């Protein structure tokens, strides 16, 4: 299978930017174990990275239509800041509209996926790998779906999002 990333990594500058965008969120010596105690830090670091690389700009992947079956029609829910308002099925329906295409949204999903995977410790990867069918779409890595699985598996114990996340 040909990597989606090849097309936009033709120059050294683009490769450097790509590797910066997909760096682990945590410092290398402190990876994310998918534990509740690390979750707020994980989400804060993800929020910073997502803003930095434009994932939360209008028309980008983190802004999920309330009805993902009708893409690009609002109102929109910010997946990174309001993750508890979306089910995995809504996220998957949204990501299916662009995953595997040769465009920025598909590339950003792949970038998010790689950054998240590089952030997980061995323990975190072991918890997440069993749900591979939930974060892969037609053989493609789906960044938002992976994020939703990570959130669910982190067993959040804060705020009112607990019941929503556990049910989804």
Regions found by a protein language model. Give the residues of each.
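Short, well-ordered secondary-structure elements
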Residues: 61-165
């Amino acid at each position: 299978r040909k990597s989606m990333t090849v097309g936009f990594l033709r120059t050294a500058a683009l490769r450097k930017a790509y590797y910066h965008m997909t760096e682990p969120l945590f410092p290398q010596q402190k990876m994310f174990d998918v534990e509740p105690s690390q979750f707020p830090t994980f989400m804060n670091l993800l929020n910073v990275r997502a803003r930095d690389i434009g994932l939360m700009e209008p028309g980008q992947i983190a802004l999920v239509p309330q009805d993902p079956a009708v893409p690009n029609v609002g109102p929109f829910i910010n997946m990174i800041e309001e993750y508890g308002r979306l089910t995995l099925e809504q996220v998957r329906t949204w990501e299916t509209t662009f995953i595997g295409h040769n465009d920025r949204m598909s590339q950003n999903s792949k970038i998010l996926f790689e950054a998240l995977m590089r952030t997980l410790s061995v323990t975190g990867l072991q918890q997440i790998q069993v749900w591979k069918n939930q974060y892969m779409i037609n053989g493609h890595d789906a960044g938002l779906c992976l994020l939703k699985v990570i959130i669910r598996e982190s067993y959040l114990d804060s705020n009112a999002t607990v019941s929503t996340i556990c049910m989804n």
